[in-house]
Amino acid sequence: MNAYTKQKIGIFGLGKTGISVYEELKNKYDLIVYDDLKAKRDIFEKLFGNKLITILSDSRWQDLDKIVLSPGVPLTHEVVRIAHHFNIPIISDIDLLFEKSKNLKFIAITGTNGKSTTAALISHILNSNGLDYTVAGNIGVPALQAKASKDGYVLELSSFQLDLVKIFTVKVAVLLNITPDHLDRYQDMNGYIAAKAKIFDRMDKDSYAVINIDNDYCRKIFLLLQREQLIKLIPFSVTKILNNGISIVDDKIHDNNLTYKLPLNKNLQGLHNCENIAASYAVSKIIGVESKKILESISSFQSLHHRMQYIGSINNISFYNDSKATNAISALQSIKALDNIYWLAGGIPKEGGIEGIKPYFNKIKKAYFYGQAKTMFANTAKNIIDCVICDNLEYAFNIAYKDAVSDNTEIKNILLAPSCSSYDQFKNFEERGELFIKLSKNVIGSNYLLSNLRIFD
């Protein structure tokens, strides 16, 4: 018998996470469920019927043993108020996974940017070297739907998920970076920083914190943990060589007193990916993988879709899909990594637009702005870079490709780094990225076919 036997549990939020929680707990406990969005309730009803769907005003929400909250639900929501008023604990799907897998190792990664790539890279390194780690969490696979693992889990955790965990404890925690984000959910930066720092809660002297000390907010957390002396600390940097820690400087990995050449990988370009590599290297060493094996695995890593994803090249034009770059800070990382850029950007703009990218406009050959942000972005870029206002991404791509073909520069890059959310023209950033991939592959394929047909002329 476990802690949840015969308990009454409410599941609030019926997206991917809520559905995974329901499938985990059904037939074991007395459940009720709800979501504010009718579309989500309709999907649940189609899958499982409407018997358990219970509106919040129903008194059963006041008589629960626990509420499992989906991470997208703000902590100011009425369901949270009900839980607090009636002393009902709120837990998360991450806690449920931890409870049933306590004998396994948990590696968790958080940060404003780079989480998914780092989680995938760590998993790739470990699994390429005879271990069995499953990657899940905010990366797109709900924790409770992740395949069973023999050795452990690599979890990408957002601040929203960290807000909810109560018992989850990790062997290795990674803090990549912190920059302003989600300030519509948190009162100020201090609230956002505090949420990120929760990744280190409940860790002990046998646990490791891997922290980017180049980032001001992360460095403050590192210094606080250093004073407390409760866990083992491994700092990393991509701006200076550390005597005790991991550094990547001048295309070399510095591991305390050892130095290795940084492997070349087109899928891991840019300073931001050096941070991801440094963190992944540190974690892999902690788990017990030899340095040489780590470097080999870094070389063979294939990037995640929509995250600075190299699609291919034709006629000295390379295509990069960074559809996941939904804000300027994220887009800036891919822009820093390339030159002679034909830049596709647009959608629903975030606060500040692309102002933060202006110092790097010299890397952009021409910009193609589309969607709701097109006029705003063009006003920021005018008189600095050549730009075109477009109706949609496909039109922007076609004009950009035509311009790149007529450019005699030796190396050219067509980059989708939207700096916006996608919801004005797409369901999500994945759909946006898939269109870019399709357009890129069509161009690469047709050019390859033409070049081969000319052999027979």
From Swiss-Prot:
Q: Which GO terms describe its molecular function?
A: ATP binding; tetrahydrofolylpolyglutamate synthase activity; UDP-N-acetylmuramoylalanine-D-glutamate ligase activity
Which Gene3D superfamilies does its entry note?
Answer: Mur ligase, C-terminal domain, Mur-like, catalytic domain, NAD(P)-binding Rossmann-like Domain
User: Which ranges does the record mark as transmembrane?
Assistant: none
Name listed for the protein in its UniProt record: UDP-N-acetylmuramoylalanine--D-glutamate ligase
Q: Which InterPro entries match?
A: Folylpolyglutamate_synth_CS (IPR018109), Mur-like_cat_sf (IPR036565), Mur_ligase_C_dom_sf (IPR036615), Mur_ligase_cen (IPR013221), MurD (IPR005762)
**GO biological process annotation, one example:** peptidoglycan biosynthetic process
Iron as a keyword of this entry, yes or no, is no
Residues binding ATP: 111-117
Pathway, per Swiss-Prot/TrEMBL? Cell wall biogenesis; peptidoglycan biosynthesis
* Main subcellular location: cytoplasm
Instruction: Tell me if Cytoplasm is a UniProt keyword of this record.
Output: yes
Q: What class of enzyme is it?
A: ligase
Query: Which family would the database say this protein is a member of?
Result: Belongs to the MurCDEF family.
